[in-house]
């Protein structure tokens, strides 16, 4: 799941690998075992990786909301503070009741309460008393994308007199965040009617229609409690007393706008092409009556007709009768599973009449709504360990140093070997034990923790502008490595706090505890001074308190020494300490804003300086000619194209005439190209050396690239094993037809088999061939390869549907696998793409790149109950994408090589990979699967859910602090009905293609997790973008390195 700019709220829910599921027993049997476990590493890991980040995401959304309230209040008071409104020569006080019309030509402001004041932001350029300017063509079309739901096309011009264009964006952003919190279904409509009042033309006059008071009161009632979470009430500039209701005047047909007054609620979604859900969400009209819960409340399916041979769910969905009373929730509300006749020998009857398979009883999952399937269950049946007092706990809680059984029996008879410290671990001051590389397989000298206090260079980008450059670990938060610190909650929290400007030296303080200064002489930490900690806490703790969080316990200031202490040195900032981290942009005013907000089209600095000098050259960046995209110079000529026309990878080298250019732009002699040995450092001189050439007769001739020239392969001495090698090398499966075709050309280019090719032990075909020898048969090889079958589900019973998702039938997703490590168990989902190859996301291996600690489990549906179809393979190789960056969670993909081939069965078989040019269209429906969280727990059974593909442009609107790139796919629902949760990281997003084959298009990467309704859709790594890289890496590992 990288830590340069601070992480967006939505990213914090997608941690680097999911935690081991905290096993669930019967509620009565479990007692308080789990609640007592908060101090243990297992549950603490669950809290840090799941609950806290999700809460933090919600919290930071509220912090952002708070900042927008403050911004709007500032704009309001700046414009209204001391400037009385003059109407007909009289000075008005505060709180005038508006008639809810804004006239360009004349005023219609009521003077019933002359002591009231009209907020300046609700007036247009002409003051109400100014009748000197008539404008009969003041209406203009509404083009703002956030307000397309408005049922009218025209608004007034000029718009709000005191709200500049950038402030208008902030004004609407305030309502956008309220909308995401779902406090009132029409809150966005309310904001848009304020920003763009409907333009009504009445003869020579034009006036605007403001919201009705009842509309305002409904919005206030729904959202004031949300604002209360950040210690704000309904803003004064939105007070409802200034608006009028329709019934208060009869001489004007329409004096205010209300959603109830429109003829047909569909108009609220605009222009008739959209559908208004009962929840207030607008969806494209084409999604109505398509069998999917796009509205979150099934209102888009409520009035749809089913044919006579289909079952009509209470949700409105139509089902094949074969899916009724089969134990699976196909309707989404269990209406297809009620009042069923259960087989008493094979099925359990739930209280609502649903029948579930007997093997689901006492398996640790509550499959019945009334939980009757988990009553009177033994610990063993649920995969748990029984305490002496009958309490059930997970097996990993045994002998871990914490008493989880109330009688303490889980810590009895524990030998030294059973403790968390294993042979070879180092015992350290701040952590019970550390392995020699801090959990990392990249065991370079800087990572070595053999003496647990060795100084190492600072590599955490967040803190690379400190006045010192060496640190040692573990740090004051207990992080064992800088990589672990980079993916921690604290490395996201402090940069977000810095933006609030709560304390000038907060960033310096946070870095002194994230990357403590290391004394090069003693190897010991030099801590921050107590005063620095106390000042940071005093000024910034209140900001956390606003959203219900506490100052991190690990930063207890009493542990740090006083300044000028006689017996210990400590750190205090001097006047030259940089206030903003490298992950921030420093405004001219000194304010720090996230670097990702620099030049994003929206002013975040109070002096707007983050939107100045935004040209690529002005920011010392390289500009793509085609789309003016700005790139860092470090990605130019790095072998990975970033510009749409690949211009960043052109003209990167100047090879001689007898040389060819490698993919990384190095130069290698032509004679060395495709000679069986890698001469380019990236092995690109050995890529695509064997191909098939199709002529007009559709015969596939085997071609070999040698010294920049194509050659035919002579048939002399050819054997079937060579056809197998050729097809495998090209990634085309097994050979089905091999032919020897007579050559018609007079002087063909031949490559012939080496005389003793069988003893060469070559791994590629082209290294077994030689040039310069005659072909006696004058015949060339024609080859037809049969691709390995993929994407089939022979064991699946069709038609089924993770947060809002459903339990999946065994064998339905035979490519789904579980990436596991000891002792944690399931960490991430993964996908089988070939007999020996698996895909997952790169962030699952953050700090855990050692292949020896991983295994892959396939053919399993219930994590807690081994299956007869289950296959387990150890991991041989882990290949992370070299451009993977946690700072933006981009290039989030990795390839895993298994220790041996899988045995292909109906329950274990690979999925198909897409073609590089095969991209998903918006509003396509696909499936996600995994063992992610369903509400408040991680299920044992594999879950599945349908999701709709969302355009990248629409997706970007949900993520202000992240950039959605072409390496990503967005999927989910505006309502957040179904989306992948934490444990699904690395799991598949698959779509069914014609012929019943399933193709892998995405890997669950980041985005919305537990609060998808708040944070928008899920974000997936775009497999289509990476197909060439995937195939290249498999080829290199198979033929060039092995």
UniProtKB/Swiss-Prot annotation:
CDD domains tied to this protein: CRD_corin_1 (cd07445), CRD_corin_2 (cd07888), LDLa (cd00112), Tryp_SPc (cd00190)
Occurrences of domain FZ (ranges): 134-259, 450-573
Lipid bilayer topology: Single-pass type II membrane protein
Gene3D superfamilies membership: Frizzled cysteine-rich domain, Low-density Lipoprotein Receptor, Trypsin-like serine proteases
Cellular compartment(s): Cell membrane
Effect of residue 985 to A: Loss of activity towards NPPA
Known glycosylation sites: 80, 104, 135, 141, 231, 245, 251, 305, 320, 376, 413, 446, 451, 469, 567, 651, 697, 761, 1022
Enzyme class: hydrolase
Consequence recorded when altering residue 244 to A: Does not affect autocatalytic cleavage
Disulfide bonds: 139-199, 147-192, 183-223, 212-256, 216-240, 269-282, 277-295, 289-304, 306-318, 313-331, 325-340, 342-355, 350-368, 362-377, 379-392, 387-405, 399-414, 455-518, 463-511, 502-540, 529-570, 533-557, 580-592, 587-605, 599-614, 616-630, 624-643, 637-652, 655-667, 662-680, 674-689, 790-912, 828-844, 926-991, 955-970, 981-1010
Annotated site location: Cleavage: 164-165, 427-428, 801-802
Record-linked PANTHER family: ACROSIN-RELATED (PTHR24252), ATRIAL NATRIURETIC PEPTIDE-CONVERTING ENZYME ISOFORM X1 (PTHR24252:SF11)
Note: Initially named CORIN due to its abundant expression in the heart.
Disease: Pre-eclampsia/eclampsia 5: A hypertensive disorder of pregnancy characterized by new hypertension (blood pressure 140/90 or greater) presenting after 20 weeks' gestation with clinically relevant proteinuria. It impacts 2 individuals, the mother and her child, both of whom can be severely affected. Preeclampsia is one of the causes of maternal mortality and morbidity worldwide.
Entry note about domains: The DDNN motif is required for targeting to the cell membrane and enzyme activation.
Protein name: Atrial natriuretic peptide-converting enzyme
Organism: Homo sapiens (Human)
The gene coding this protein: CORIN
